Amino acid sequence: DPFVQLGTLDVPMVNVPNEKQADWVLVGNDKKYRIQSQWDYSRPVDIYLMNVKDGSQKLLAENVCIGGFSFSPDGQYAVVYDKVAQDWFLYTVATGEKVNLTENMDVEFVDDEHDTPSLASANGSAVWFEDSKSFLIRDKFDFWQFDPLKPGTPKMFTDGYGRKNDTQLSVTQIIEDPDKAPMNPMMRMFGGAMELKKNETIYFTTYNRTTKQNGLAMKDKGKAPVKKIVEGPYTFGDFKYSKPGKGKKGIFVYARGNFEEGNNLFASYDNFKTQKQMSDINPQQRDYNWGTVELVNWQTADDIFCEGLLFKPEDFDPNKKYPVMIYFYEKNANTLYRHRNPSPSRSTVNIPYFVSNGYVVFVPDVYF
C-alpha cells in the first residue's frame, strides 16, 4: 500500500487513536486563523477527520478553541473541550454527530481560577477505559463517568470525595511494567491521556487546596469508594507498585520531597503505614544554612482571602531583625511543599540563596 501523508504545514495537528487499524485520524487545521492569532490568544482550529487510506478529509467542527481532547481507544469517538462554550462535547467519528456532554450539569468543568487574558481550559483531559465503553471527565474536584452510547446520563465516579475534602483528584497510572502502559504518544500533548481497565485499581494523585498537602488515593477495582492511601506535607511523584507475591505485601516505590528535604526515593512495604528512605540525593545541603517555609493568609480591605509563602533562614531568631525580599508574581501558594534548588536566575528570586544568606523572603499570591 502507498504511504499517505497525514500531517502537512497546513495541518500540523494529527491525533491517532490507540487502535492502530483505525480508518480515521483527527486533524486540526489552523491556517485561516494564524493571522488573528497575533492578537487573539484563543488560537481556534477547524477539526477534520482524515481517512488514513486515501487522505480525504471530512469537516467535523469549525472555529473551535480546544482546551482538552481525547480519542477513544477504538477510534470511534472524540471528546473535545470547547473553551468558548466551556463545555465538553462528544463526536461520533462515523457520523460526525456532536453531543454537548456537560451543559445540563450542576458543576463547572472550566478552570475557574484561570486569571490571564485568554480563554480558560478544562480541569484536565478526558480519560478513557480501554474497552471504549466509558470515559472520565473531572470537574474542579471529582471525576464523572460518561457512556458514549448514553451521553446524557453521567455518573459520579469518585463519590464526591474531592469536593467533600477540598481535594483535587487527578487520575494517575501505576503499573508494574512501564513498557506495558497504553499511551498514545500524540495525546501526551493534551495532558497525558491513558487507558484504564475496569477491573483494576484506579489511582489518583491528590492535592488539598486548604493544607496544600499532596498524596495518593485509590478506587479498588473501579467500584469501591475512593480511599486515601497517603497524604502529607510533601510533593510525591513517579509512583511505582510491585504486586505482592504469595504471602507477601505489595511495595510502593516513589519520589518524595519538600522545601526542606530534597526529592529522594522512598519505599513503603506496608501500604504507607511507614515510609523508608532509599536515597540521600543531596547530603551537602546539611552543610549550609538552608531554610523553612510556612503558609500565611490574610484578608484584604476588599474582603479577598489571600495566601502567600513565608521563607525564613534555618537559624531564624524571632528576636532579630532581618532584611526582607518580596517576590510578587502570579500564584505560588500551591507550591508550598515543592523543593527549590539554589541556582542563578536572570529574573526570578532564587529563594534558597537568599534565605541561606540571612534574608526573609515573602511570596504573596497575586489576585486579578
What are these regions (language model features)?
Residues 1-252, 257-263, 267, 341:
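Beta-propeller folds
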Residues 223, 237-368:
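Serine-hydrolase catalytic core recognition
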